[in-house]
């Protein structure tokens, strides 16, 4: 099993690589790529950790050596948010990066499962899809926007508010991966009750959690460590699924188009990627209104990505 981390010298990439070096199954290969010359050094540093995961680092303009033979590709390359920026401000730089990486993946490892972390995810995933379609290698079962951070934040914040064990809390999160498009289904959290005020405040906090970290870091970065943890959780889920385990995770995928062509929802993962898109259950009136209210934004985000590749 080979996992490639693209953008491995960045804050998310280094955190993700550290976690994967410790947690991938024994015998796995971990490839790190970044345009930054430090990347082989990141791999050298991590290679001193005593686990049965081989690691190599590659720098420069061409990600091909890292991508060759990859089963899973996790893309965190791009610029990070700074105070005053929203995820859309990242588009101008990150769209081109994701497009060029998808073009290489289409040639080098077209059968890999691809997890896109690079923001704005609502838009970068459709960009990758359009590139892969043009190359004739698109498989919607194998392209994912990683929204796991919204899930782990929701689990953490609910556990804090209600005095629960965060490892036991399960919160479905649907929609997209920015602002109002992030919709935690708090009505479905088992074993806890929320007041209307708590639901409104908690939903807003989950939607704005990225901004909370950007502002707290005061210009020194964005949510890199928690995102590394979230990406590791999703990456390991893909690895387990490819090895034959049945795994359920939330991800931003091309679905049946009921609300938008791409939508974050629960998926059953298997050896070919998405085996089944699962229903997300009944919504409360608050959640129905929030879903209706986000769709224009989400569909617009998707269209921007499609148009970028035309």
Swiss-Prot record:
The active site is at 177 (proton acceptor). Catalyzes the reversible oxidation of malate to oxaloacetate. Belongs to the LDH/MDH superfamily. MDH type 1 family. Keywords: NAD, Oxidoreductase, Tricarboxylic acid cycle. PANTHER family: MALATE AND LACTATE DEHYDROGENASE, MALATE DEHYDROGENASE, MITOCHONDRIAL. Homodimer. This is Malate dehydrogenase. It comes from the Bacteria. NAD(+) binds at residues 7-13, 34, 94, 117-119, 227. Pfam families: Ldh_1_C, Ldh_1_N. The lineage of its organism: Bacteria, Pseudomonadati, Pseudomonadota, Gammaproteobacteria, Vibrionales. Its EC number is 1.1.1.37. It catalyses: (S)-malate + NAD(+) = oxaloacetate + NADH + H(+). Substrate binds at residues 81, 87, 119, 153. The keyword NAD applies. One of its GO terms (biological process) is tricarboxylic acid cycle. One of its GO terms (molecular function) is L-malate dehydrogenase (NAD+) activity. One of its GO terms (cellular component) is cytoplasm. The gene is mdh.
